[in-house]
């Protein structure tokens, strides 16, 4: 018989740096999950991702207090900021441009995020990532 799902917990945790402090501890503690067990499993699974990159994770908590989790790719905005070498996007993206990314970098980010995006093909995903870049005040160069 399948286990009964008690809750879904969505968090963004720095890759390889999960620890019991907020936001992980309180969110999982409320559900009765063994926090250290999650932290060890998450850190082991995210070893291949650059340490410190915020990684979305969806944790499925079952009624017997066991859990499973699925990691997603880092948010597009974080990958774009890293590619452009900036700390934050523009407060006025239509007026103030804060950096540049090449279309090759945008395509690479789209291919990285392909598993999590709902676009029908790579070109649609590239356009979506380019739109995110423009809304952050980045210029997309050919």
Curated annotation (Swiss-Prot):
The keyword rRNA-binding applies. CDD domains: Ribosomal_L11. The keyword rRNA-binding applies. Keywords: Methylation, Ribonucleoprotein, Ribosomal protein, RNA-binding, rRNA-binding. One or more lysine residues are methylated. Gene3D superfamilies: Ribosomal protein L11, C-terminal domain (1.10.10.250), Ribosomal protein L11/L12, N-terminal domain (3.30.1550.10). One of its GO terms (biological process) is translation. Pfam families: Ribosomal_L11, Ribosomal_L11_N. SUPFAM superfamilies: Ribosomal L11/L12e N-terminal domain, Ribosomal protein L11, C-terminal domain. One of its GO terms (molecular function) is structural constituent of ribosome. One of its GO terms (cellular component) is cytosolic large ribosomal subunit. HAMAP family: Ribosomal_uL11. Forms part of the ribosomal stalk which helps the ribosome interact with GTP-bound translation factors. PANTHER family: 60S RIBOSOMAL PROTEIN L12, LARGE RIBOSOMAL SUBUNIT PROTEIN UL11M. Belongs to the universal ribosomal protein uL11 family. This is Large ribosomal subunit protein uL11. The lineage of its organism: Bacteria, Pseudomonadati, Pseudomonadota, Gammaproteobacteria, Enterobacterales.
């Amino acid at each position: 018989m399948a286990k009964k799902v008690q809750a879904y917990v969505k968090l963004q945790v720095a890759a390889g740096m999960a620890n019991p402090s907020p936001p992980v501890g309180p969110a999982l503690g409320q559900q009765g999950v063994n926090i250290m067990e999650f932290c060890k499993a998450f850190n082991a699974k995210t070893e291949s991702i650059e340490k410190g990159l915020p990684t979305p994770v969806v944790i499925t908590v079952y009624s017997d207090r066991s859990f499973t989790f699925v990691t997603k790719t880092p948010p597009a905005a974080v990958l774009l900021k890293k590619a452009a070498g900036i700390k934050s996007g523009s407060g006025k993206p239509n007026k103030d441009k804060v950096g540049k990314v090449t279309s090759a970098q945008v395509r690479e980010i789209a291919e990285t995020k392909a598993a999590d995006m709902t676009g029908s093909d790579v070109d649609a995903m590239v356009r979506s990532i380019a739109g995110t870049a423009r809304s952050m005040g980045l210029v997309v160069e050919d």
